[in-house]
Amino acid sequence: MPELPEVETTRRGIAPHLEGQRVSRVIVRDSRLRWPIPEDLDVRLSGQRIVQVDRRAKYLLIQAEVGTLISHLGMSGNLRLVEAGLPALKHEHVDIELESGLALRYTDPRRFGAMLWSLDPHNHELLIRLGPEPLTDLFDGERLYERSRGKSIAVKPFVMDNAVVVGVGNIYATEALFAAGIDPRREAGSVSRARYLKLAIEIKRILAYAIERGGTTLRDFIGGDGKPGYFQQELFAYGRGGQPCKVCGTTLREVKLGQRASVYCPKCQR
């Protein structure tokens, strides 16, 4: 599933080609996503100029003069730029054609993504209860410490809770906990303030670096420019269960936490 760095990579790839451009038409070949694409999307968006392409958590917000298209890539979706009129292949469900001659094409083999229309996106039911962005000053170790008091849930699913902080998915939670030396099974309420301060620093560092590297290449992900990400080449824990720790050589262990696989080093993480 594309996580925050992958979505931000996509945003940075498509924004320069969309912002300031006028939409000539919208072609919806299959509206059956996680939530149906609005039947009148072409009517709502065609003729409008795209003002800004923003991101909130893992949602892309394509802001027009009136209204905003909220897009989520789901498990396997991607948005990329193609020449308008390029014949569509299987799973290429939507084209947003621009007067420039380019089209923003949405591909989603599993159809778990979304394309929704809203006049007030930040108060949309999918966005209104989201926590702070991890790369802003609204998120820090103090917030993690305060929100974790009395929590018996394991620390990994705690930091993956979008009400606590957005965009820390399975890959980056695994890597940040490894870098901070925290066992992902530890109860969130038992982690000290000092260790949460360290964890927040690592979350920010790892997410920022992953964005710089173009995200993580996993299964279907490609950026808005059609290129894969390269952060996977530098993973220390995620997907490495049974392999030696790159720091100490101990065999990494894999456990299930909140229905997700979690890999950790029993020596480096306490």
Curated annotation (Swiss-Prot):
Q: Where is the active site?
A: P2 (schiff-base intermediate with dna), E3 (proton donor), K58 (proton donor), R260 (proton donor)
> What function is annotated for this protein?
Involved in base excision repair of DNA damaged by oxidation or by mutagenic agents. Acts as a DNA glycosylase that recognizes and removes damaged bases. Has a preference for oxidized purines, such as 7,8-dihydro-8-oxoguanine (8-oxoG). Has AP (apurinic/apyrimidinic) lyase activity and introduces nicks in the DNA strand. Cleaves the DNA backbone by beta-delta elimination to generate a single-strand break at the site of the removed base with both 3'- and 5'-phosphates.
Q: Which PANTHER family match?
A: FORMAMIDOPYRIMIDINE-DNA GLYCOSYLASE
* Binding-site residues for DNA, renumbered to this chain: H91, R110, K151
Keyword annotations for this protein, in alphabetical order, are: DNA damage, DNA repair, DNA-binding, Glycosidase, Hydrolase, Lyase, Metal-binding, Multifunctional enzyme, Zinc, Zinc-finger
What is the recorded name of this protein? Formamidopyrimidine-DNA glycosylase
Select a single GO molecular function from the record's annotations and give it. Answer: zinc ion binding
InterPro entries in the record, alphabetically? DNA_glyclase/AP_lyase_DNA-bd, DNA_glyclase_Znf_dom_DNA_BS, Formamido-pyr_DNA_Glyclase, FPG_cat, MutM-like_N-ter, Ribosomal_uS13-like_H2TH, Znf_DNA_glyclase/AP_lyase, Znf_FPG/IleRS
